[in-house]
Amino acid sequence: MGRFIFVSFGLLVVFISLSGTEAGFCCPLGWSSYDEHCYQVFQQKMNWEDAEKFCTQQHTGSHLVSYESSEEVDFVVSKTLPILKASFVWIGLSNVWNACRLQWSDGTELMYNAWTAESECIASKTTDNQWWSMDCSSKRYVVCKF
C-alpha cells in the first residue's frame, strides 16, 4: 500500500510540473496556437493602420502577425491559404524605407526628397509568403498574433 501511495504521489508531482510547459499552452476560442503564440485569420479587408488597430482590440498584446522563423511562416500559410485562397494579408511591417539611411551614388547625404506622401506597408502572399510592398491605404486581409 505504501509503495502505491509513493508511486501515485510521484506521478502527481510529474503531472503538476509538466502542466506549465508548452503542452499546456492554450489559446482563446477561435485562435490557433503555434510555439506559445496565438493566431487568428480574419476575412475582413482593411487598410494597414486599421488592421493593426483592429488586432490590438482583439486581445491584449495582439498585433498584426510577425514572423520569427520559416516554420512559423509555414504554420500561418497553412491557416490562411484554405480560408483566403490566393490573396494578400497585412503583416506587421510598415514604413520600411523610412528606417533606411539613403544616400546618393556620389556619396552625398540625401537632403532633399520628393517621395510621395504614401507610406509603404508590407503584405504577404497567402500562397507562398512572398512579401510585397504595398500602399498602406489599400485593403488587405488580416492575421493577428499575440
Swiss-Prot record:
Signal peptide residue numbers: 1-23
Subunit comment for this entry?
Answer: Dimer and tetramer of heterodimers of alpha and beta subunits ((alphabeta)(2) and (alphabeta)(4)); disulfide-linked. These two multimeric forms are found.
Keyword Signal annotated: yes
What's a GO cellular component annotated to this UniProt protein?
A: extracellular region
Cysteine pairs forming cystine bridges in this chain are 27-38, 55-144, 121-136
Protein location: Secreted
- The protein in question is named Snaclec mucetin subunit beta
